[in-house]
Amino acid sequence: MNVLIVDDEPLARERLARLVGQLDGYRVLEPSASNGEEALTLIDSLKPDIVLLDIRMPGLDGLQVAARLCEREAPPAVIFCTAHDEFALEAFQVSAVGYLVKPVRSEDLAEALKKASRPNRVQLAALTKPPASGGSGPRSHISARTRKGIELIPLEEVIFFIADHKYVTLRHAQGEVLLDEPLKALEDEFGERFVRIHRNALVARERIERLQRTPLGHFQLYLKGLDGDALTVSRRHVAGVRRLMHQL
């Protein structure tokens, strides 16, 4: 896959080019871009599959560039590589598939590049278009701070949310992350896709597999993607879960 690097710092461009060059299956396009205007021009002429994009640049910044790319039918995948970690929310709004904080590590870059396939790009671009009603609608991704920087998790990959004191654990297809968001706020935003099964747990409706009663009279909910593990359903939510399962 062809990769275009966009950064206003020459040393940063050189380092990213070196890291990409060490990975099989990727080719760094020349020339690279040092600002947003150059980036858009080179994207038009070079047709990259992936853009490694800095955020803070003179003129058009990286978020503005990505927003313009969202307007295209088949935009390249955008992976932000930035020294700033405070732009994660804006990043998923412009369909970024990765958000890496400098200094970028080779293994994190490799993982982000793997996610940047063309079907995912088209899908992400569609997800970030405003609803026809004109409302803002729920997020298509959830951002979480991890050891790799800021991770953007597609909502369709989320299996459950479980609250534990002031944090919420998000379980997704590739693992778990911690969120600093109230469970109630997540329920209010994503209630059409998730159902409450306990005062501290929300599960993805489409992941529900079966409800089972234990010999002690408790109820366990088995979810697709959990490899046989189950979550406890509180008695007050059993009837609602059963009704939902009849509708699925």
UniProtKB/Swiss-Prot annotation:
Role this protein plays: Positive regulator of the algD gene, which codes for a GDP-mannose dehydrogenase, a key step enzyme in the alginate biosynthesis pathway.
Residue ranges annotated for the Response regulatory domain, each copy included: 2-117
Example of a GO cellular component annotation carried by this entry: protein-DNA complex
Official protein name in the record: Positive alginate biosynthesis regulatory protein
Domain HTH LytTR-type: 142-247
PROSITE patterns: HTH_LYTTR, RESPONSE_REGULATORY
PANTHER family: REGULATOR OF RPOS, TRANSCRIPTIONAL REGULATORY PROTEIN BTSR
UniProt GO MF annotations: DNA-binding transcription activator activity; DNA-binding transcription repressor activity; phosphorelay response regulator activity; sequence-specific DNA binding; transcription cis-regulatory region binding
Record Gene3D superfamilies: 3.40.50.2300, LytTr DNA-binding domain
Gene Ontology biological-process annotations: alginic acid biosynthetic process; bacterial-type flagellum-dependent swarming motility; negative regulation of DNA-templated transcription; positive regulation of cell motility; positive regulation of DNA-templated transcription; positive regulation of single-species biofilm formation; regulation of DNA-templated transcription; regulation of response to reactive oxygen species
Alphabetical list of Pfam families matching this protein: LytTR, Response_reg
Keywords: Activator, Alginate biosynthesis, DNA-binding, Phosphoprotein, Transcription, Transcription regulation, Two-component regulatory system
Gene: algR
Top-rank taxon: Bacteria
